[in-house]
Amino acid sequence: MEKFTMSETKVWSGRIDSADGPTAVRWHQQVRAPQEDSPAGVALIGYPCDLGVYINKGRVGAANGPDEIIKALANLPWRLTHPVYDCGNIQWEGELEDAQAALATKVFKQLQAGHSPIVLGGGHDVAWGSFQGLRRHLDQAAPDKVLGILNLDAHFDLRSDSEGASSGTPFQQIAKYCKTAGKPFHYAVFGISEYANTQALFDRADKLGVTYLKDTHCGYTQLGPMLRALDAFLSKVDCLYLTIDLDVLPAATAPGVSAPAAYGVPLEIVEAMLDAIQRKALPVLMADIAEYNPTYDIDSRTARVAARLAARLAGLLGKPTTKA
């Protein structure tokens, strides 16, 4: 079995409220490294890579994201009934594709072990690595299951990869893979900014049959229609891969990202979408949190948001996956 290394011990540390009894526990007191016979749970995987952001001409710094999210997560109150494992950060040498391949291998192994991965990025090129690992697992465990990809993001990330992969190309790469493999490409993006995507990207999304809602249609007054659109998409698929780019949030909420949003989708709306997914009882096989950039954060504001979302996702994903 692959040997796993937990993130630095100093990261998993925090307050201990022993005087308040056995239920006054926090994440740092519960998370462990996985063992060969570990019961099914949630597997945290770090993707400390921002090469894709650099290639995409973005502001780098997201490589430091995973450990900073864990620092914020460590001190949160523990509210889960299933285990969470720290599988450490991926280890790789070389180019972006090498990092994505290393991630794919780690995601696949955790899914095969019955765990539900949550990958902490890192640039949104994380999605190509996550998808490859998930697709390999499904091809062995449940090849007939229809996979849906839900991306909460200000960007389509459908840029051409003709000159190489980047943080802007993962879903174009997935679309090409699906076409070659004869698989349906069920991709939805909620939170799209009209001012952060060229017309060429809107045209490509339309050509590929992408379901999307603009950020201006994801506000409080549009909550009903937005949730109906989400439900319609979820009804088309058997299982879900959920990926959250933190730049979907307003810059005031998430300043520490590679490309901050001028408008954005409120955190309350993002969490309403998570609630809707949970009510749907659709299997969420894995999730990502992408583009956290500590270099530009303010008072760890974005780290706290990312940690909150990670904790929510851990509750949403905490069901055994199908083993091959």
Curated annotation (Swiss-Prot):
Top-rank lineage group of the source organism: Bacteria
Protein name: Formimidoylglutamase
Signal peptide span: none
Cofactor: Mn(2+)
Family indicated by similarity: Belongs to the arginase family.
Keyword Metal-binding in annotation: yes
EC nos: 3.5.3.8
Reactions catalysed: N-formimidoyl-L-glutamate + H2O = formamide + L-glutamate
Pathway: Amino-acid degradation; L-histidine degradation into L-glutamate; L-glutamate from N-formimidoyl-L-glutamate (hydrolase route): step 1/1
